[in-house]
């Protein structure tokens, strides 16, 4: 009977490897395998609902996520050397990169694949429709236009990817 029992953590590891393997077959190995093998460490406040939804978005997209509840993320950004003007409600670290705000998982994968000389990615201002900020009720499916910024080592930024607005559906 014991040999039929698989620990929950072992099941998760097997599932991650299977997902990474399927992704590697269809997308190439570099970005999917790297993302599945890396752990994203997230600092957020314990009561922030959108942070929890963003973490779920990352997990759904194959990332291993460790969360740390803090009263304020400002000190973490400062410790990581990430410019405060890009600050949002949560801060994450993945390898050498900082991820700030509601950055989509696909953009994190592209960052890992391209490996630019940069501090990381940021989505300031918590735009409606970004991962973790999906609207509900009358705002379901609505997205404000927003940019994912590549924050360079000198503290400047450039647009990494732009997302167009999706207006509300008129009934």
Regions found by a protein language model. Give the residues of each.
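Stable alpha-helical elements in mature extracytoplasmic
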Residues: 47, 54, 69-72, 104-108
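Thiol-based oxidoreductase modules, predominantly thioredoxin-like and allied folds used
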Residues: 65-76, 86, 94
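Conserved helix-turn-beta segment immediately C-terminal to the redox Cys motif
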Residues: 56-67
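N-terminal secretory signal peptides
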Residues: 1-13, 17-27
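Thiol/selenol-based redox catalytic cores and closely related redox-interacting motifs
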Residues: 85-169
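Boundary at the C-terminal end of the N-terminal hydrophobic targeting segment
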Residues: 33-37
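Local sequence-structure signature of Cys/Sec-based thiol-disulfide redox active-site neighborhoods
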Residues: 38-53
